[in-house]
């Protein structure tokens, strides 16, 4: 059930340069999701972070996890952004950075629902590069009408 840009735009309001998910490769509604982000030297953030040794900012890896989690929230609720809703960050806990992410890396972003109540979700999330853990966090999002 791959979801590419043309389908993702129905779930996420983000657009270039802030859409940080290239595709969804697996999803079990109400349970878990896996997304992909291909990191290239052409990313805007590499202009300043850092020009001589480009490293993806950790906060953007957290945003990748939040965006993938938002897609899972929409799919689990049977909604799209076109239904007049957004999923917004409500919290982030237990963030741990384990590995630098550099141009050429492919991020495998996994999110698993650990709690859901009235449009509020908590997820356990990880980002891997190949088999190596790059970052982990608990992400909380909340559904809001636009």
UniProtKB/Swiss-Prot annotation:
NCBIfam families: fabZ, PRK00006.1. One of its GO terms (biological process) is fatty acid biosynthetic process. It is found in: Cytoplasm. The active site is at residue 49. SUPFAM superfamilies: Thioesterase/thiol ester dehydrase-isomerase. It catalyses: a (3R)-hydroxyacyl-[ACP] = a (2E)-enoyl-[ACP] + H2O. Involved in unsaturated fatty acids biosynthesis. Catalyzes the dehydration of short chain beta-hydroxyacyl-ACPs and long chain saturated and unsaturated beta-hydroxyacyl-ACPs. One of its GO terms (molecular function) is (3R)-hydroxyacyl-[acyl-carrier-protein] dehydratase activity. It comes from the Bacteria. Pfam families: FabA. InterPro entries: FabA_FabZ, FabZ, HotDog_dom_sf. Signal peptide: none annotated. Belongs to the thioester dehydratase family. FabZ subfamily. Its EC number is 4.2.1.59. This is 3-hydroxyacyl-[acyl-carrier-protein] dehydratase FabZ. GO terms for cellular component: cytoplasm; membrane. It is an enzyme of class 4 (lyase). CDD domains: FabZ. Keywords: Cytoplasm, Lipid A biosynthesis, Lipid biosynthesis, Lipid metabolism, Lyase.
């Amino acid at each position: 059930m791959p979801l590419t840009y043309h389908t993702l735009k129905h779930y996420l309001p983000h657009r270039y340069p802030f859409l940080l998910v290239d595709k969804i490769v697996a999803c079990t509604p109400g349970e878990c999701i896996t997304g992909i982000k291909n990191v290239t030297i052409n990313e805007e953030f590499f202009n300043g972070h850092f020009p001589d040794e480009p490293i993806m900012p950790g906060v953007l890896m957290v945003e990748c996890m939040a965006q993938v989690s938002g897609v899972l929230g929409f799919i689990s609720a049977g909604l799209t952004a076109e239904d007049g809703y957004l999923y917004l960050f409500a919290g982030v806990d237990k963030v741990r950075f384990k590995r630098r992410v550099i141009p050429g890396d492919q991020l495998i972003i996994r999110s698993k629902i650990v709690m859901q109540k009235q449009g509020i979700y908590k997820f356990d999330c990880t980002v891997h590069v190949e088999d190596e853990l790059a970052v982990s966090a608990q992400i909380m999002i909340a559904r809001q009408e636009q």
